[in-house]
A protein has these predicted regions:
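Histidine-anchored nucleotide/phosphate-binding helix
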Residues: 71-82
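Conserved G1/Walker A P-loop phosphate-binding module
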Residues: 2-21, 27-30, 125-161
């Protein structure tokens, strides 16, 4: 940083730089964030530390198996709304259940009005419904517990599966 009065940029930040011919360009400032996720920075003085910025949608992922947890979904929805972005709920691993109607009813109870999609990265089921969010100029953050299929979904959307 040129001036030491700002936090370092985070994923998604836009910055102003001063280009230097030797390749060691300087960040002059971080531009204002439209949306962001933060966490409490560890240490004796609690303060927020941004972990992602300037995204349009938060894909909140819960798998249709033993991982499904309405209380966790509520917490993730709160984080998404606080970020300033639009939450979208993805119920993953549709290939592992015969009937997902009860899950959809529970999601509707917890998150009335939030767009919800049932998907499977393995079979491709429901992925076409995500195209409306994945348009040029849109940025998406994936939020979910370990094992819900975040990496598998990214790979499927990128055509690697």
């Amino acid at each position: 940083y040129f001036v030491d009065t700002q936090d370092f940029p985070t994923t998604g930040d836009f910055v102003m730089i001063r280009y230097v011919d030797d390749g060691d360009s300087l960040i002059l400032t971080t531009l204002p964030r439209r949306t962001y996720f933060s966490r409490r920075e560890p240490g004796p003085i609690p303060r927020d530390q941004a972990v992602a910025a300037n995204f349009d949608y938060v894909f909140i992922m819960q798998s249709l198996n033993m991982d499904f947890n309405p209380k966790r979904l509520e917490r993730y929805l709160t984080l998404a709304w606080q970020s300033g972005a639009t939450p979208v709920i993805l119920l993953t691993k549709a290939d592992l259940v015969e009937d997902y109607w009860d899950y959809l009813m529970e999601v509707d109870r917890v998150a009335t009005g939030v767009n919800t999609h049932v998907v499977s990265a393995q079979t491709g089921y429901g992925l076409n419904h995500l195209n409306r969010y994945l348009q040029p100029g849109n940025t998406v953050v994936f939020l979910g517990s370990s094992g819900v299929g975040k990496s598998s979904l990214v790979n499927a959307l990128a055509g690697a599966v």
